[in-house]
Amino acid sequence: KLSLTTPVKKIFEAINSHSSESEIRYVGGCLRKILNNEKVDDIDLATNLNPSEVTEILKKNNINFYESGIEHGTITAIIDDYKYEITSLREDIFTDGRHAKVKFSKDWKKDAARRDFTINSIYADLDGNLFDPYNGKKDIEIGQVSFIGNPEKRIKEDYLRILRYLRFFLNYSKQPHKEEIIKVIKINISGISIISKERLLDELKKLLKSNKLENLSKDKFSIDLILLIFPELKNIKSIIDAIKVKRELFVDLDFMFTLFLMIIDETDNLEYFLYKYNISKKDQKRAYAISNFYNEKNGSKTLNEVNLNKVLYYNGKQAVLDILNFKIIKSKKLDKKMLSLSELYKNKITPSLPVGADLLMTRYQIPEGRQLGSVLKLIEEEWV
């Protein structure tokens, strides 16, 4: 039985009452998580109506929405600040290894057939009655990740499914990799090269968010495959140390920091990764703040309050905590000095330069321009 909220009931009632043939069902991740006793964060819905019919119904029932992926038949409804993606049933009419061209359908079985894995092709109505044409519920129960139909055909439709397979295997599998799937992935791994860097990084982020990341250390096939796709993650086993520290210190290690653990070393690995994946300026600055400490010959000696205060001023509190967490994890032990510094900086406020341009101009009559900037910079350097 599904636990329903009033907002989603409103959407069900609006579409189901449209006509005797209109239907809407839960689909995909929310059902997979419910059946696996996980917390549900997003609710996806599928309907046998086309997008224009869905938008008319939402308007009629005063439900706010926006066209989030209209070319793929997706409308996002918004009720009480919650978002619900409503996607029309589809059939693939063309795939090229990256994208699919679709047509809208009325056939639930055909919509299920175009999905990647059996555990993602489960639907349920308002009362929780399942439509499960590929026995996804059973695969969840026995811990098996199975492609729908021919694995090679499904991978060739979208090569990102290789990385998606690793993510779902990590989260749901209680079985070893099937030899057939290993063989098919090895044959088709080169297809990953046509997938955009943005999609690859987004899928990696989902994989690294797994609460079963520790299992990766026991899965040589998955580690080897990740390194084939992301060769810069050469220190991938660092994430196991990170998980242990996270558990003991109750620290939140976000995606970017987890990435930095795997790519920062004494080589130009970091620079190459940041360039290759077009990482934002903000995250680049964060990475270099860590790297500048890590690459010092006597890194532990530089981790004192004087130098950390400089980082605090120029880069902010997060940069200081990143440096300390990085050092703790890389040392593979809970260093008392590092822990003490970490506690100290958690409560520190980023300082501000007590002298400004206005003071220099009014009290010392320094004219606005290059001279003022130079004097201000000298004062700042001395103060820091």
Regions found by a protein language model. Give the residues of each.
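Catalytic cores of the polymerase beta-like nucleotidyltransferase superfamily
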Residues: K1-V384
